[in-house]
Amino acid sequence: MTFDSSGEVPVTFAQGVLNDVGEITAISPGDNPERAAEVKALKHRIAELLVECKANPFVGELMGPGLHPELATCRRVRFDIPSQKGKPRFRLIYRNEPSDGAPSECLWLTIAPRAGLRAHRKAQQRSRL
């Protein structure tokens, strides 16, 4: 187990995760001010998740066997911005390494929309690499 001096677990990103963040937080020149405010809140929420995972790599719920057995040891966080009503629209899927015992690394596999199981598909692809 290798914690840094602050007692936090390092968070690393699978290839493509930063692109995921860019996709869901992109603003077009024609977007209205409400969209810009939503994107700002979403960026803030993602930053909070990073801090939460560093402090507690078990913050997400264990996925377990189910529709995606290859993600059984992964964890997921359902999240959205505070003003959004209804089901959270986004998922963070990550894996603690090693998966048993005290993790030395929190590997984010994806941050993507819930719709169409996009987050799960991306995590599946990246977990094989």
Q: Model features per residue range: what roles?
A:
Residues 51-84:
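A short, surface-exposed loop/turn module that caps and links secondary-structure elements
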Residues 1-8, 72, 78-129:
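Enriched for short, Lys/Arg-rich terminal
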Residues 18-21, 68-70, 116-117:
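A short acidic, often aromatic-flanked loop/helix-cap motif at beta-alpha or helix-coil junctions
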